[in-house]
């Protein structure tokens, strides 16, 4: 018994002395890592988010912001997306011998990548995207980081040739180098990159190498081509049968889709934008791509009809085909896409009536079928209103649709944007019998139609969402719904406007009677266009419209003086009161002093600057006649206010969340690819454009 105790005591001592160096080494390692981070923190100009980085807390690095530790307590990951400012020059990479992941995306780091980054021998993941790094990628990054698998450098100012980069990254599984200043063509080396799963390159020259077909493990491919020559999609692309995400853009792409793409049966997202591709979308493509959740083929030259097999894509959430030359009827089978929430068929050559099945898309949030040759009417019988309970944006402008104002839409409680412009709608707008008619509407454009009669006060009083000038309570699904304004020859992108932008455009109709006084209650209104109607009476009081930026009342039958209260509208940047019957002196205060002569011409009894007609004792000048010819010329030169509701952005629809943006969806961006990569590898990535 005594002997056993002695043996046990002896073994415990051996274990203690054996483990002591390891424990001391762990403590020392934590202190070294912590001190290195604190030293680097002091060189950053904005580090309020890093208050937890303190020398008195090096034994608990897990509590530090952006730090992940392994089981021994040593730092294994650094994840910082905090808009930090500074460089990497003072970061002692050699202190982090166990670091496997370095994610510094979405900051404001600048300068070169230090060659000492090669000291991170165990690094498998490096993300420096969306910063301001410059220069060439250091040679040591390629030669010394033998365990590196994923490299993301998107959105910087790196230089150099793709040849020198890709030939040294053959062991990687993921490479994303989009939005930089790299030059040269893609080298024909894909045969030596058998493990590649993710490839994202933009702004390269030359063609897509046929050797891309050797990337049998490739799952995500995003390529943008900028070349003076024209190239076709290589048929070898069809050999990449594991592709789930394919994005191709660039005006150098020509020809048609190769039939070999029918082999890409795992595709969930296909985006082909801003190219010169032509031909038809054949039925065999649709029947092969039954896993699609997002199909975005926009701004190309595709022709022909949409195959009826489109109804087989039951997983589809996003269908964007705008900016092509598709023709024929809109297939009624689209009504079978019960998961569809984004539909954009605008700017094509579709004809015939709108299929009634389209109103049965129960999940649709954004619907844009504008700028086609659609005819017929839309009426309550077109579908079950409850099916459209989620609809927020509807644009059927620039077609040939007729009938009365679609008051059946007033029950759509989530409707925010309604564009009916440039059709043949007619008749009067009656007083609504619904208590909350269009209560959430923020943008309405019914210009260039044939509406007549007196505009009811109650019609405008229903626009409750426009009433509050400080209303920022907008859901994310609408916050990025954007439009392009064409205003007097100038294009404005609503990305530069406030997110709670509101607009009423009733111009170029045949409304008559007084302008409803209820217009003065819409305090949150930014744009009011009533031009080219037959409104009579005085200009109503608009002094409460303190957010108003654009007011167009030209070419009506308005009388009386210009209300002095208009001088209180300090946000007003556009005004047109021309070709009415206004009289008296133009108020010489505030914003009214900034507008040109063209804002007031065609009112013979107006006087004062900027007109040449003097007031009071001044010498009168010849008055301009209000001729029909002059009025028509003015209408042609001043096109008024037009809307084109378009797609922006946001991941691939419900693949990535709520609606982030109408414009983002219409125009393909490499960020779609990056966002998808981030989703797969669980990277927190907030968008930042440069």
Task: Label each residue range with its predicted role.
Residues 1-690:
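Plant-biased, solvent-exposed loop and capping regions
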């Amino acid at each position: 018994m005594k002997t056993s105790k002695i043996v046990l005591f002896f073994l415990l001592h051996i274990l203690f002395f054996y483990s002591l160096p390891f424990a001391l080494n762990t403590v020392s390692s934590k202190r070294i890592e912590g001190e290195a981070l604190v030293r680097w923190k002091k060189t950053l100009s904005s580090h309020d988010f890093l208050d937890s980085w303190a020398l008195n807390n090096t034994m608990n690095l897990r509590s530090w912001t952006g730090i992940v530790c392994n089981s021994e307590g040593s730092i294994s990951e650094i994840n910082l997306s905090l808009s930090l400012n500074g460089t990497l020059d003072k970061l002692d990479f050699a202190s982090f011998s166990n670091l496997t992941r370095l994610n510094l995306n979405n900051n404001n780091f600048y300068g070169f990548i230090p060659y000492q980054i090669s000291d991170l021998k165990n690094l498998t993941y490096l993300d420096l995207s969306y910063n301001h790094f410059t220069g060439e990628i250091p040679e040591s990054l390629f030669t010394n980081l033998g365990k590196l698998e994923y490299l993301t450098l998107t959105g910087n100012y790196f230089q150099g040739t793709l040849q020198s980069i890709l030939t040294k990254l053959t062991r990687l599984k993921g490479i994303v180098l989009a939005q930089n200043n790299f030059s040269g063509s893609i080298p024909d080396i894909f045969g030596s990159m058998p493990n590649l799963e993710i490839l994202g390159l933009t702004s390269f020259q030359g063609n897509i190498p046929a050797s891309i077909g050797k990337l049998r493990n490739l799952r995500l491919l995003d390529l943008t081509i900028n070349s003076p020559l024209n190239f076709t999609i290589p048929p070898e692309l069809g050999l990449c049968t594991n592709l789930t995400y394919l994005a191709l853009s660039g005006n150098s792409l020509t020809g048609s889709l190769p039939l070999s793409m029918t082999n890409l049966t795992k595709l969930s997202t296909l985006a082909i934008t801003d190219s010169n591709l032509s031909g038809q979308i054949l039925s065999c493509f649709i029947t092969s791509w039954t896993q699609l959740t997002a199909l975005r083929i926009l701004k190309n030259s595709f022709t022909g009809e949409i195959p009826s097999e489109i109804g087989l894509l039951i997983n589809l959430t996003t269908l964007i085909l705008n900016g092509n030359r598709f023709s024929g009827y809109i297939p009624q089978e689209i009504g079978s896409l019960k998961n569809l929430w984004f539909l954009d068929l605008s700017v094509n050559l579709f004809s015939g009536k709108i299929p009634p099945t389209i109103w049965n898309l129960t999940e649709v949030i954004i619907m844009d079928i504008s700028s086609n040759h659609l005819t017929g009417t839309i009426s309550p019988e077109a579908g079950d209103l409850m099916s459209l309970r989620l609809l927020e944006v509807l644009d059927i402008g620039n077609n040939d649709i007729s009938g009365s104002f679609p008051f059946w839409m007033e029950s759509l409680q989530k409707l925010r944007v309604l564009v009916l412009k440039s059709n043949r709608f007619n008749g009067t707008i009656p007083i609504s019998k619904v208590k909350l008619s269009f209560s959430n509407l923020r943008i309405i454009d019914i210009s260039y139609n044939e509406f007549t009669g007196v505009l009811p006060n109650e019609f405008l009083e229903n626009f409750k969402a426009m009433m509050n000038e400080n209303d920022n309570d907008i859901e994310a699904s609408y916050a990025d719904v954007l439009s392009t304004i064409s205003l007097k020859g100038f294009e404005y992108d609503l990305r530069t406007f406030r997110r709670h932008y509101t607009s009423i455009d009733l111009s170029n109709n045949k409304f008559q009677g007084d302008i409803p006084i209820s217009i003065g209650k819409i305090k949150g209104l930014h744009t009011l266009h009533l031009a080219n109607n037959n409104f009579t009476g005085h200009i109503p009081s608009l002094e409460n419209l303190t957010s108003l930026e654009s007011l167009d009342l030209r070419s009506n039958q308005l009388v009386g003086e210009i209300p002095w209260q208009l001088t209180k509208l300090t946000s007003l940047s556009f005004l047109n009161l021309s070709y009415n019957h206004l009289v008296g002196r133009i108020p010489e205060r505030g914003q009214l002093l900034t507008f040109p002569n063209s804002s007031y011409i065609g009112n013979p009894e107006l006087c004062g600057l900027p007109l040449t007609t003097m007031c009071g004792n001044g010498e009168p000048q010849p008055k301009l006649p209000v001729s029909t010819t002059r009025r028509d010329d003015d209408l042609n030169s001043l096109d008024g206010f037009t809307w084109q509701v378009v797609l922006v952005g946001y991941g691939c629809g419900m693949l990535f969340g709520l609606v982030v943006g109408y414009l983002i969806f219409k125009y393909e961006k490499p960020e779609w690819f990056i966002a998808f990569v981030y989703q797969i590898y669980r990277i927190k990535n907030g968008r930042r454009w440069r």
